[in-house]
Amino acid sequence: MAVKRMWGGRFEATGAKWVEEFGASISFDQQMAAEDLEGSLAHVTMLKETKILPAADADQIITGLKKLQDQLEAGELTFTVENEDIHMNLEALLTEEIGPVAGKLHTARSRNDQVATDLHLYVKHRLPHVIQAIKDLQKVLVEKAAANVETIMPGYTHLQHAQPISYGHYLMAYFQMLQRDVERFEFNQQHTDLMPLGAAALAGTTFPIDRELTAKLLDFQAPYANSLDAVSDRDFVLEFLANAAILMTHLSRLCEEIIMWCSYEFGYLELSDQYSTGSSIMPQKKNPDMAELVRGKTGRVNGHLLGLLTTIKGLPLAYNKDLQEDKEGLFDAVKTIMPSLKVVAGMLETAHVNKEKMAQATERDFSNATELADYLATKGIPFRQAHAIVGQLVLEGLKTGTTLQEIPLAKYQEIDPAIGEDVYHDLQSKVAVERRNSLGGTGFDQVKAQIEAAKQLLSK
């Protein structure tokens, strides 16, 4: 039997089955069922308080909605394509439960402000979980950084050995990236904390509703100030997706380095078996698949952002059916970033750090060349001249297989007689790292200060 459309009074014919399926959104917007019921309960409570609905009718609707909430939690609700979307499906189920009085729930409300409210609630509910998941990863970074303050490794520019650094310093760089992610998502909460309900289709309503009461019931900071903006605004979704894309880009950069460092050529890290897989043909393989998946999933999250930007860019005010396309990318982004954060945290927490291999990589790579140039500058040689001198020494060393610390003192004293035995002390990788104690530098004291500051942030 055909379903009677709640909007069908103006129509003489129904669309083809395939058109109905094309227009339906229940396959994905059912993920907002809890938010839709939450919004409806607040709306009908407001209608009761303002006496727009008789108390008896409102109480009957409230009882029915609460029963649907229980059934939803128990997984007992069944949705149909014939009822198009989550709003119509739940209203149909409410009608089955309490009869025609269910139709009064939609008084002073449109699906336009209803879906916008659902979407706000969906993002509002998930933002704290996203922020906490980022902080959980930050805690792992801080813990591992604290254990590796004096672990020496090559620092890179252009993927070439540049200067020796502390592995703890490296990890704290990602902590700072993630802290900016936290701050962006926290700012996202401000724009999400506005309530569209009461804007109706686009122009408000003639009923004497109390939007401030509804906002309070739903724990929103305030209602939207403009009804057109309320039903058409998806900036908060764009912000979430932009933040998610930046977050995933940070995770992807980290995973790229994890992948490289687990290779035989680097050998700095070894992931635990829990976060690795093997090969169906090559028995020796231990592949960093989880890191590769996070790197790969970054593309899809970036795509969701670009997709919604493209959808919205040409929409006239106020609501358009195009906005049905605002949800799937959002839902998928949430389902992508949460396990990605957990996987990266787990990989780092359980990875073996090959400290010896890291340190050895700094011994014959000439990454102490800047130390020698700085040393010469302290002897009164202009830095540019010192730079050129060290460059020549590096070139000579590359040809002869001699490191800077293997050059005889007599050779150094040909450059400047003031050069003493202490030059060899300064050329040690650990000393080079330890001495870089400028604010924010890789010096051990600075890294410890970064870690303490991070712990303070995480304790708030």
Swiss-Prot record:
Q: List the disulfide bonds.
A: none
Does Ion transport count among this protein's keywords? no
InterPro entries listed in its UniProt record: Arg_succ_lyase_C (IPR029419), Argininosuccinate_lyase (IPR009049), Fumarase/histidase_N (IPR024083), Fumarate_lyase_CS (IPR020557), Fumarate_lyase_fam (IPR000362), Fumarate_lyase_N (IPR022761), L-Aspartase-like (IPR008948)
Which transformation does this protein catalyse, written as a reaction?
A: 2-(N(omega)-L-arginino)succinate = fumarate + L-arginine
The cross-references to SUPFAM superfamilies, in alphabetical order and at most eight, read: L-aspartase-like
Q: In which pathway does it act?
A: Amino-acid biosynthesis; L-arginine biosynthesis; L-arginine from L-ornithine and carbamoyl phosphate: step 3/3
Which GO cellular component terms are attached?
Answer: cytosol
Record GO biological process: arginine biosynthetic process via ornithine; L-arginine biosynthetic process
Location within or outside the cell: Cytoplasm
Main localisation: cytoplasm
The enzyme's E.C. designation: 4.3.2.1
Give coiled-coil spans as residue ranges.
none
Query: What does the record give under GO molecular function?
Result: argininosuccinate lyase activity
Keyword terms, alphabetized: Amino-acid biosynthesis, Arginine biosynthesis, Cytoplasm, Lyase
**CDD domains given for it?**
Argininosuccinate_lyase
Family membership noted in the UniProt record: Belongs to the lyase 1 family. Argininosuccinate lyase subfamily.
> What is the name of the protein in this document?
Argininosuccinate lyase
Per the UniProt record, the source organism is Limosilactobacillus fermentum (strain NBRC 3956 / LMG 18251)
Q: Which gene encodes it?
A: argH
